[in-house]
Amino acid sequence: MADTSGEVAAVPASGAANGLSNGAGATPAQPNNPLSRKLHKILETRLENDKEMLEALKALSAFFVENSLRTRRNLRGDIERRSLAINEEFVSIFKDVKEELESINEDVQAMSSCCQDMTSRLQAAKEQTQDLIVKTTKLQAENQRLEIRAQVADAFLSKFQLTSDEMTLLRGTRGGPVTEDFFKALGRVKQIHNDVKVLLRTNQQTAGLEIMEQMALLQETAYERLYRWAQSECRALTQESCDVSAVLTQAMEALQDRPVLYKYTLDEFGTARRSTVVRGFIDALTRGGPGGTPRPIEMHSHDPLRYVGDMLAWLHQATASEKEHLEALLKHVTAQGVKENIQEVVGHITEGVCRPLKVRIEQVILAEPGAVLLYKISNLLKFYHHTISGIVGNSAATLLTTIEEMHLLSKKIFFSSLSLHANKLMDKIELPPPDLGPSSALSQTLTLLRDVLASHDSSVVPLDARQADFVQVLSCVLDPLLQMCTVSASNLGTADMATFMVNSLYMMKTTLALFEFTDRRLEMLQFQIEAHLDTLINEQASYVLTRVGLSYIYNTIQQHRPDQGSLASMPNLDSVALKAAMAQFDRYLSAPDHLLMPQLNSLLSATVKEQIIKQSTELVCRAYGEVHAAVMNPVNAYKDPESILHRSPEQVKTLLS
């Protein structure tokens, strides 16, 4: 590049311009001219793509500041001098670098000598401590092995042994409390006892058996302590408001694994609650509630039904409360028979109140407050027996047995009272009253029956039991009543007796019609009423026929035989007698109500009276029809029969209807 620059600088400016114009205007005359080739090369060079050229020009511009002939001629020398100065400077700098490197080399040589010395010494030391290294390696391996064994031992102990704190919790002190941590420790013992069975299937059977025995002893110790604590807690539950703690509930859950201790604890709870319930019952009877509200139950002893009802209601509430307490106590117990345990303990708790309850109810029943009250008390006892049995659920419970005994006693006294009443009816039978209405004894007995049935209808005794009682009550009352009425009317005439019986039976029927389960009895009474109605219907028809003079004529016609001759030839059946009878019959037809038996006016039921009149009228019409047919029959030799009987049977029916 220096040579090129020098040559370029030596060419005059005008010449260069002429050369360029000549080269551009025509084909070069001397293509092989070196200068021309260089110029063409320079002119064809693309400086933007030649980075080295650009850098060289930039460097040249730094010291080539004046473009003159002199500077162009001396350019080569200037560049060489500058290059020499730069090289001298480079040599000077590298001399310093060399000196530094030599210093470093000396240091490195010293360090190398030191390292060789140390290596030699270490090699010597290594040769001298070879045995120690071997021993150290062995000890390290042994230490690692022992650490692994220690970890295994720690894991084994944590898996199959209790901590000292857990041991202290399980053994505890005699009167110490039981906390949540106790149950966690007990659960840990159970878990270890189950997990140790894995060891029995390995070569560690001896260790497994020892651990199992140790855990079994700890379990027994813990259960014994838990049992004593639970017993103490149960003995303290003597307040009416029994608050079962969560810890005691957990204790019962844990004790279910020891059925004997579990049973003893339940018995202790039942004994404590039994004394509480007995004390509460006696207080309710004699002292009442806090501050005298509610009042003592004994204050209502003058009202037998309320007295018995209040006692039973208190016991029902107490029984339900005790069952709730037991359910709270055993809510976490999962063993079979929990329901039976609750029923058994509730039965034991309520057993203590049976004696005072029985004595008081017996006093009420044996005082014979009356059949109605006895029946209400009987139904009340039956209802509470059914209700409490839903809580106790065991028919063998003493409380249920006592209530059932009192129910049977009240029922027995009730039916004895009814039987006594019935016997009194038969011992002193009253004559029917002059109006042939029901007797006072019948009215009183039916009032009693109505009150009994009304109390029975309003009771909450189960349906099947109510129906059975109904049948027995009706048999005990109605059968003697019917017998009394029959005996009482036995000395009366036919119509009077039938009227009295219809009135009595009608009153019985209207009384029973108000109540359920009486359909069968109502049917029986209706059959008897209809039998006596038939009698009254016949009597009324006979009464009418007798009063109008047709009775003899009708009876004779019915009994007449053809071999006796014609009816007209028989005594009192001639035309004159028939015309006289027809005259009376016409008066009857004009006012039939004037020929009613007096007994019909004594009937209590207007419907029955109308029925008798209607059906007896039909009998009269039928009798007239037979008389009319006989008179109109030529065989009977009546002359001009139309003048004797001038009305046809249809006309008679029309007039009487």
Swiss-Prot record:
Key words, A-Z: Golgi apparatus, Membrane, Protein transport, Transport
Entries under SMART domains matching the protein: COG6 (SM01087)
Region (Disordered) location: 14-36
One family name in Pfam for this protein: COG6_C
Membrane topology of the entry: Peripheral membrane protein
Major localization class: Golgi
Record's GO cellular component terms: Golgi membrane; Golgi transport complex
Family from the record: Belongs to the COG6 family.
Function field: Required for normal Golgi function.
Assembly mode: Component of the conserved oligomeric Golgi complex which is composed of eight different subunits and is required for normal Golgi morphology and localization.
Protein name: Conserved oligomeric Golgi complex subunit 6
